[in-house]
Amino acid sequence: MERVNLFFLHGFLGRPSDWAVVKAHLPQHDGLRIFTPDYFKDASLGPQHTFEEWAGNFIKLVEAHGCAGERNILIGYSLGGRLALHALEKKPALWYKTILVSTNPGFNDPHESFDPISEERRQRWMNDSYWAEEFLKAPWETVLRNWNAQPVFGGGETEPLRIEKEYSRETLSLALTQWSLAQQKNMRSLIQKNIQKVIWMVGERDEKFMEMSRRLQEEVQGLRLETVPASSHRVLFDSPKDLGERIRQLIQQLL
């Protein structure tokens, strides 16, 4: 029997511990291995690397764990979902399934990275650059309060307590520009090519991402879209038991 390997990628400001409740709902089985890399602490996975460089380094990490040829499932939340898309692009055959939670597929345009000719990308770049400066210099409590007050995070639980000493401000700041949505290419064709591998999850109270996901269903034929009840953008914190149960059902048939 092939082993099943789960790789969880947290979001911006995230920690591996964010997945604790999800992991608690998964079966205890000798054939199941769980990995929760901390890409803000691992130099090979940090934002000093571009999306493409990051994907190459992440694939090396996965293969170093002896996972090639096994059932590998990649679960990414928010920024972690966008990174997961690049890992899927880098080596599709490595992944049995990719679960993308509260994930943005990128602007629906032909640009490969930031291009000021795109008004959408220019506006996003300006916004992310503002936050990069805030995370670098503003008082920690102030920047966290303002970050959490953004409309996209409304209607749900706040994140766990984030303690300044557990982070490098320089790393957080760099992540906001290096991995800005303005730098990300359109991933719709990738999703279409790997449609059998992709599970797209979104919280039903996440108005922005619900609308985006419905459009994505029209743009990508056969997309498996799962709506998580009573959840905002922060599905991971609003409904970790629900998320864990969905993953459990997926892997139960493989063990």
Which role does the model predict for each range below?
Residues 159-190:
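Hydrophobic, aromatic-rich cap/lid helix
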Residues 207-212:
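Conserved alpha/beta-hydrolase "acid-adjacent" motif
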Residues 194, 200-202:
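Short beta-strand/loop motif that positions the catalytic acidic residue
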Residues 89, 97-134:
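Flexible "cap/lid" loop of the alpha/beta hydrolase fold
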Residues 2-45:
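Conserved HGGG/HGGXW glycine-rich cap/lid loop of the alpha/beta-hydrolase fold
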Residues 53-72:
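Conserved acidic catalytic loop of the alpha/beta-hydrolase fold
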Residues 231-240, 244:
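Catalytic histidine-centered segment of alpha/beta-hydrolase-like enzymes
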Residues 76-80, 84:
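Gly/Ala-rich beta-loop-alpha elbow adjacent to hydrolase catalytic centers
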